[in-house]
């Protein structure tokens, strides 16, 4: 699930809501300890002025875009019920959004990821492809300081499983689907150059992994598996504005408590050679009590460029379960050419199709790129086209 990508997008907008829009090209390095985060933060730095007066309709028609590539490296040590795991993830995210008449923001983000997980020391491996589409929305509740953020997303997972058993290969394919959402309420209190931002948040998600049957000696048949996510968060963030007439400079930090209230899942299976008995393993990951710490900077230069950096640490607090995740986020932003247009739309009734289009005018030529995705069959029904027209 990737709800934090949208939340970080909205946080950037509000920290810099007195500036013009920027488009972001991001890079993320994520070095994980014994606890891997299931909600991976993705920083985005595109923003436009949000003022107290009502914006005009032409402004609300403008769409702004952001893109991001990320690399995640992680390791989970061996436990009494699971082998050691090493993880490598590569992903690309692209999003578009617009500003609403109520001074809010709404948009969509599309993410494609590749996961490579090595299990144990004998060559067992899990390769996965993930597809996610996330809708995000923020609206003021009473004034320009109190906002409610709403996130909703769907995803598809395709996995290739290789198990090394007594020197032989046991293989299987598995697919899954997920739905997730976040509701966050936050307020702002300003004193001189400091802004204090308390917030409360709830994350909900459900993933269904389809059953599968391995092929090979000692193969097992696995039933459908359901995994539920339920997090409660309370946080206090601080933004210090040190801007000058030549550039914008803001440093910010956050301290957050997270309660992971649902961490278990049942893994039900039987051996192909003996279907008379069903075995059940109760899997539990993570800790109930967690503390997240974050520090970062935003720098905006006058010539269309911006720099964005965050260091984040997620630390477990439970006795008997020790783990942490260290994340480093880096981003460089640039204001796009005014002759370039971006658009995102959803259409359909029985089949819901998303369309993303980029149009650019170069001299007398109009160049457009269109990407269409059937949301009912993520990763299976996609179309891309490039068109070039000359204006006489």
Language-model-detected regions and their locations in the chain:
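Membrane translocator/pore-forming domains, dominated by Gram-negative outer-membrane beta-barrels
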Residues: 1-12, 16, 59-392
């Amino acid at each position: 699930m990737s709800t934090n990508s949208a939340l970080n997008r909205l946080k950037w907008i509000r920290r810099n809501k007195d500036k013009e829009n920027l488009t972001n090209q991001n890079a993320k390095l994520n070095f994980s300890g014994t606890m891997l985060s299931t909600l991976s933060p993705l920083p985005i730095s595109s923003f436009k002025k949000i003022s107290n007066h009502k914006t005009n309709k032409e402004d609300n028609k403008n769409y702004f875009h952001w893109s991001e590539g990320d690399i995640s490296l992680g390791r989970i040590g061996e436990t009494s019920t699971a082998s050691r795991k090493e993880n490598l993830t590569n992903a690309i995210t692209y999003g578009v959004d617009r500003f609403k008449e109520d001074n809010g923001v709404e948009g969509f983000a599309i993410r494609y990821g590749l996961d490579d997980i090595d299990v144990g020391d004998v060559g067992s491996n899990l390769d996965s492809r993930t597809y996610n589409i996330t809708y995000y929305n923020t609206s003021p509740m009473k004034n320009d300081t109190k906002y409610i953020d709403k996130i909703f997303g769907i995803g598809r997972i395709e996995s290739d499983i290789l198990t090394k058993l007594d020197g032989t290969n046991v293989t299987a394919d598995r697919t899954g689907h997920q739905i997730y959402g976040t509701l966050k309420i936050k307020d702002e209190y300003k004193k001189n150059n400091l802004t204090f931002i308390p917030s409360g948040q709830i994350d909900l998600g459900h993933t269904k992994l389809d059953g599968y049957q391995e092929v090979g000696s000692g193969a097992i048949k696995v039933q459908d598996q359901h995994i539920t996510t339920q997090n409660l968060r309370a946080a206090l963030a601080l933004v210090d504005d040190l801007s000058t007439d030549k550039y914008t400079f803001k440093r910010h930090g956050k301290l957050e408590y997270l309660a992971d209230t649902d961490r278990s899942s049942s893994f039900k299976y039987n051996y192909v050679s003996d279907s008379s008995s069903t075995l059940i393993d109760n899997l539990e990951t993570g800790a109930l009590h967690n503390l997240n710490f974050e520090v970062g900077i935003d720098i905006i230069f006058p010539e269309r460029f911006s720099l964005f950096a965050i260091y984040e640490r997620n630390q477990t607090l439970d006795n008997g379960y020790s783990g942490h995740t260290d994340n480093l986020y880096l981003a460089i932003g640039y204001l796009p050419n005014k002759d370039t247009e971006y658009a995102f739309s959803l259409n359909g009734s029985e089949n819901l199709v998303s369309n993303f289009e980029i149009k650019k005018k170069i001299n007398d030529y109009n160049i457009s790129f269109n990407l269409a995705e059937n949301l009912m069959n993520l990763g299976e029904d996609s179309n891309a086209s490039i068109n070039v027209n000359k204006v006489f």
